């Protein structure tokens, strides 16, 4: 049994398979998941698990080069936006409109659906390299 890091076997497998610039999405419970993209559904009830809890665990186990967020999060969910900026200090940040964000999710290797039920609590993580 693993002692630390991501214990969820599906998430651990996706993280291990990522190459440089590949993307994964951590999403609230309302983000549409495009056909053909792997869905890892962690939601058990509204708010559980939280977006920020899942983001922290994944970020601790992943080399992240860039982060993409919907620009609407700035005005509609400032608290989550601030927490993302505090948790992910090193990667570059990119903000796009929500419609563009949803288009970008079509290229993701996987979308991790949380129980989060606050607006625009979604992030695209772009894989970096460890060297």
From Swiss-Prot:
InterPro entries xref list: D-ribose_pyranase (IPR023064), RbsD-like_sf (IPR023750), RbsD_FucU (IPR007721)
Keyword field contains Phosphoprotein: no
Metabolic or biological pathway: Carbohydrate metabolism; D-ribose degradation; D-ribose 5-phosphate from beta-D-ribopyranose: step 1/2
Keywords: Carbohydrate metabolism, Cytoplasm, Isomerase
Enzyme class per UniProt: isomerase
Active-site residue list: 20 (proton donor)
CC per GO annotation: cytosol
Binding site for substrate: 28, 98, 120-122
Catalytic activity from the UniProt record: beta-D-ribopyranose = beta-D-ribofuranose
EC number(s) from the headed UniProt entry: 5.4.99.62
Origin: domain of life: Bacteria
Any Pfam family matching the protein: RbsD_FucU
One GO process term, biological-process aspect: D-ribose catabolic process
A GO term for molecular function: monosaccharide binding
Subcellular location: Cytoplasm
Family, as annotated: Belongs to the RbsD / FucU family. RbsD subfamily.
Function as written in the Swiss-Prot or TrEMBL entry: Catalyzes the interconversion of beta-pyran and beta-furan forms of D-ribose.
Subunit structure: Homodecamer.
PANTHER family (UniProt xref): D-RIBOSE PYRANASE
Protein name, UniProt field: D-ribose pyranase
Gene this protein is translated from: rbsD
């Amino acid at each position: 049994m693993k002692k630390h890091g991501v214990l969820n076997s599906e998430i651990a497998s996706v993280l291990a398979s990522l190459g440089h610039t590949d993307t994964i999405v951590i999403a609230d419970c309302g983000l549409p998941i495009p056909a053909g993209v792997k869905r890892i559904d962690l939601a058990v009830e509204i708010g559980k698990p939280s977006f920020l809890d899942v983001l922290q665990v994944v970020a601790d186990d992943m080399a992240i080069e860039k982060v993409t967020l919907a620009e609407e999060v700035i005005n509609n969910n400032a608290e989550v936006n601030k927490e993302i900026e505090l948790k992910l200090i090193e990667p570059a940040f990119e903000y796009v409109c929500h419609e563009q964000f949803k288009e970008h999710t079509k290229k993701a290797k996987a979308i991790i659906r949380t129980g989060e039920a606050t607006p625009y609590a979604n992030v695209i993580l772009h894989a970096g390299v460890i060297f």
